[in-house]
Amino acid sequence: MTIVMIIVFCALMMLAVPVGYALIIAAGVAVLFNGYLPLSIVAQQIYDQTQSFPMLALPFFMLAGTLMLGGELGRQLLELASHAMQRWRGGPLSTTVVSSVVFGGVSGSAVANASALGSVLIPWQKKHGFPPALCAANNATSAVIDVLIPPSIPMILFSLVSGVSVANLFVAGILPGILMAASFVFVCWFVSVRRGYASQPSQTSRRQLATLALKSLPAVLLPVLIILFLRFGLATPTEVAVLSVVYSLALSLLYYRDLTWKRFCDNVVEAGMATGVVMLVIMGSAAVGWVLTFDQAPQQMADWVAANISSPIVIILMMNILMLIVGMPLDMPPAILLLGPIFVPLADTIGLDRVQLGLMMVINLGIGLYTPPIGTTLFISSSIAKSPLGETTRELWPFFAMAMTLLLAVSFIPALTLY
């Protein structure tokens, strides 16, 4: 059944069938191929997956993100980051990195981050004399920092398939997220110094910068509040997601006073459409996961690896390579939902903590978002910058090297995630 399902899924993907539908059809064909199982099992698995209580967190986190990024708040955050980094060599480039960290605590989506930030910052960076390809590469890679900063949609999905606490995953992502941001800022500085890009004179006084920081503080506090509420057990992930929406509405209505009824409706529709896409993938992955479990494929793989490969280091490296390969053609939600049930038993076999595995998977699949030839944020950023894909790829390698270094560190240094 598993082999038939994989063949059908690959064929449907080559025909450009949407991932969610491809997963459901592949699982259905596999069940029919068995000959003894009713097709209603697929429908039952799809329905059961939608009854998960933690699943309610997804639409609310997405709505909170669209509410906060759609108005004055987004402009304030961008203005703060640009003025704060302007004095640095490569400051306009570093602004993208810092903005990704700040926006990551609000949006929770790397693709949305790449589009929202790139459309504003890339034209501004080009006006400051930075080449379009470098601007695109910087935006494509920096957007992925988003998936490490709470609230992270990929981490919520991994918790669904692994049983790991969402709070533990959110906390574990903070240090790797900061390290990735710092390494990308270093790349921006190094490239600027090596190529002779001058720092930009700042027109902002310290008093004005402090004023901008105070205006943006309520938004920056959101990820901090999420961590505190989850870490100390004050609320469940779903309750925190609802509170995030209430917090976002309060800021937009009472603090920034820029929320209109039309924008609210547009934001609700936008969040609903994004949630629908993810939910379809989740439902399809539930059916595929049932077929894999019925065939005992994850356990058989874990047993085979344990019997034939004695070194945990080799196993972890193989897992990383497979995740990188899968992350190139597949978006993060389906990749996590497909690989999670396979790798969790394998991680348990070699004593790899599930939280550490979750961070490995998120970073790996995040790198896949900008890895040629099929990288979502790479294509988005190149399109915004009007840069040929080949030129953007050449500028990508210093950022890629830093991300791979962090990936290896997270894979083999548990203290980076288990603190």
Curated annotation (Swiss-Prot):
Taxonomic placement: Bacteria, Pseudomonadati, Pseudomonadota, Alphaproteobacteria, Hyphomicrobiales
Protein name, UniProt field: Uncharacterized protein y4mL
Membrane topology: Multi-pass membrane protein
GO terms, molecular function: transmembrane transporter activity
Keywords: Cell inner membrane, Cell membrane, Membrane, Plasmid, Transmembrane, Transmembrane helix
Residue spans crossing the bilayer: 5-25, 26-46, 53-73, 102-122, 144-164, 170-190, 210-230, 234-254, 274-294, 309-329, 332-352, 360-380, 396-416
Keyword presence, Lipid biosynthesis: no
Family: Belongs to the YiaN/YgiK family.
Stored PANTHER family: SIALIC ACID TRAP TRANSPORTER PERMEASE PROTEIN SIAT-RELATED, TRAP TRANSPORTER LARGE PERMEASE PROTEIN
GO-annotated cellular components: plasma membrane
Subcellular location(s) per record: Cell inner membrane
Keyword Membrane on entry: yes
Cited InterPro entries: DctM (IPR010656), TRAP_DctM (IPR004681)
